[in-house]
Design a protein with these regions (language model features):
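A short glycine/serine-rich beta->alpha loop
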Residues: 42-51, 81-89, 123-128
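DPxDG-like acidic metal-binding loop motif
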Residues: 1, 89-109
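Glycine- and acidic-rich phosphate- and metal-coordinating loops
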Residues: 40-44, 62-63, 67-84
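Phosphate-handling active-site elements
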Residues: 67-76, 103-119
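Alpha/beta catalytic cores of group-transfer enzymes, especially the acyltransferase/condensing modules
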Residues: 110-157
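Acidic, glycine-rich active-site loops and adjacent beta-strand->loop/helix elements
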Residues: 10, 20-22, 79-85, 103, ...
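C-terminal nucleotide
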Residues: 3-56, 64, 146-252
């Protein structure tokens, strides 16, 4: 569980600390590095990847909100968390959600679950990852007595109440290795996102669900960079902008 104690401010300062000694306190100003334009991905491309720091997950939410909303006030935020960091258990997404709640509550902006899900998923790209919004949707829509059914493209969510016979059942996730998003892990993470979001949808037919077993058998096990360039030459510039850690050499 991650808990955030949030205090609105009447100035543009953002001040955050953690109860864990591993994460040092920090402060930033709303007026520093204000996003320009109306295209989040284009601004991130100009900005480049920030130096790794836990503040990035909060400031990604702040900067994304600044691009699309009227943000005048900062906030104080103190974080307490039992989610093990660098474990693959979505501590980074939880922190981004806390940051999004903080900036939106402090500026009296909408905190509807769907708004929070979409905006925070994009905001986390500030850190260099290009993940989707499953973690964020799970955090916003989960219920204590239910399992959550999510679909994407189009997005839908449904909380399915557990039967009484399962009221005492506990679910646990086991992690076998660390997931610190350094350069190699981040590249592998973004590669999975790229394959799932860009490659597979371009390879399967429209009604693939009707014959998914045969469709799956026909998918290639791997594709080289050259095969991707040759197959979708008109998409390469977009790939390069969206996934710079994968395509750090120009396609030209």
């Amino acid at each position: 569980i991650m808990t955030a104690v949030i205090g609105p401010r009447d100035d543009g300062v953002i001040s955050c600390d953690s109860m864990s000694e591993e994460f040092e306190p920090w402060k930033q100003e709303l007026g520093e590095n204000i996003p320009s334009g109306e295209n989040w991905l284009a601004w991130l491309e100009l900005l480049g990847e920030p130096t790794p720091h836990w503040s990035n997950y909060v400031m990604g939410s702040v900067r994304h909100t600044q691009m699309f909303e009227d943000v005048r006030y900062g906030f104080n935020m103190s974080i307490t968390s039992s989610i093990p960091p660098d474990s693959g258990s979505s501590s980074s997404s939880a922190l981004a959600i806390c940051g999004m709640f903080a900036v939106r509550l402090s500026n009296q902006l909408d905190t509807d679950a769907e708004v929070m899900t979409y905006t925070t998923a994009e905001a986390e790209w500030f850190c260099g990852t290009r993940g989707g919004m499953m973690d964020h949707a799970t955090m916003m829509y989960s219920r204590d007595d239910s399992v959550l059914r999510l679909t994407f493209n189009p997005f839908s969510q449904q909380a399915i109440r557990l039967p009484k016979e399962m009221s005492d059942v506990k679910f646990a996730t086991l992690f076998t290795h660390p997931s610190k998003k350094g350069s190699e892990i981040k590249r592998a993470f973004n590669e999975l996102a790229f394959v799932a979001r860009e490659v597979v949808p371009r390879l399967v037919p429209k009604n693939w669900q009707d014959n998914w077993e045969n469709v799956a058998m026909e998918l290639p096990e791997k594709m080289s960079r050259e095969e991707i360039v040759n197959r979708w030459p008109n998409e390469c510039k977009m790939f390069e902008k969206m996934y710079p850690t994968l395509f750090d050499i120009n396609f030209e």
